[in-house]
Amino acid sequence: MKILKLFIVFLIMIGQGYWVSSLAENYRNQVFTPLINSAQVYLNSNQLDLPIMEINSSDVITVSFDWLSLEYAHLAYRIEHCNWDWTPADLNEMDYMQGINEVTIENYYTSSNTTTDYTNYSFTLPNDNVQLLLSGNYVVKIFNTDEPEKILMTHCFSIEEPKISLYGEVSGKSIYGVNSLYQRLMFEIIFDDGFSAISDELKVVIRQNDRRDNEVKNISPTYILPNSLKYEDERLLNFEGGVEYKKLDFSHRFRYSGEIERISFHHPYYHVEVFPGKAEIGKGYEYDVDVNGKRKINAQDVWSNAEIDYSIVHFTYPLEEPWLDGAIYVIGGFNGNYLDATNKMTYNFERKQYELALLLKNGGYNYQYLFLPAGNTKGTLVRTMGSHWETENEYQIYVYYRNIGGYYDQLIGFYQISSVQ
């Protein structure tokens, strides 16, 4: 039975593209083995907070993941500093950290009374073994001590060293018209007393709801003032408003909510069937409370975290014929908001629908159906779900600084702006 269960899990995960031959040139949240699931990196103890801590503060970064086996694995981690674009920084370990940089993970527990066996591993940073000295971007690499060069997982976090203030706003007025499908972001960077920088020393990254496909990188200021920089580029700072995220809550097997049609048990797993997705083009904007793509792993019908189970979640998007000019993805925080094989839907000609099955740990999830045109890297919701300028979105702004002759990129400001502020 155990072999059968592992075989089913492996089939799902291999279908999702978990076998990756090499690390990406730019580090990102990525898993390279089907034995790891539910990887999370967040601030302190709040799963909904982005993993960005302030330097020399009491904050910690929490790293947690499941190893889909009850057998103990000798897993460890190492940490590397990265440039603003998540490429490896040209630094020695002693430049950015004190302590040991290959640390065995000693905090773990095994699952109990679950249909999927797993061992949860977790740790926090900084800790007694690792002290981080510089601001900027970092990547955590997980590996087995028996094969230290074979990376099993990479996850990213940042340390902020505030040196600026930032003010911004989101408007429904864009180059596409007033109150259309789009939102326009405008913001101003104000230098703190005692700090100044020229625009060439700064790198700015803007994300919408922590998505990567439509992020804006390395944008230049529109206006340069004595103590501030204004960013108002009408071309680059336009984003689809999109729609509010759909929600799933299967933290309880019998009292579920959101877009769940039913939960059933087919030996040996629970299956969550999601209501079919559909385009809502032409439909007016409808407000709904969401958490902008985030997830929270939890369960209401268990006694401890070790009893939180997994379910196979089935997404469908009916279409009479497949779209040959692109692909449909299910996006959300559960896969880091990336567009890759792990969340790409497959067209079923017999059922006339796109389908995707994901092995997800029980809890609450936000998701959307995103269309990626062939040959593009930027997805769109206009075709799959619709878009409205009124939609509540969060915009994350990262400001990096490297002075002329400097040897690393500091994160001198991180700000999050809501479109409804």
Task: For every predicted segment, state its role.
Residues V20-I55, E161-Y176, V289-V302:
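Short, compositionally biased P/S/T/A/G/V-rich stretches that sit at domain boundaries
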Residues T33-H81, V178-I189, Q300-F315:
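Contiguous beta-strand segments within globular domains
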Residues M97-Y121, R212-P221, H314-N362, A374-N403:
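Aromatic-rich carbohydrate-binding modules that target alpha-glucans
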Residues V274-L324, L411-Q421:
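Basic K/R-rich, polyanion-interacting modules in nucleoproteins and related proteins
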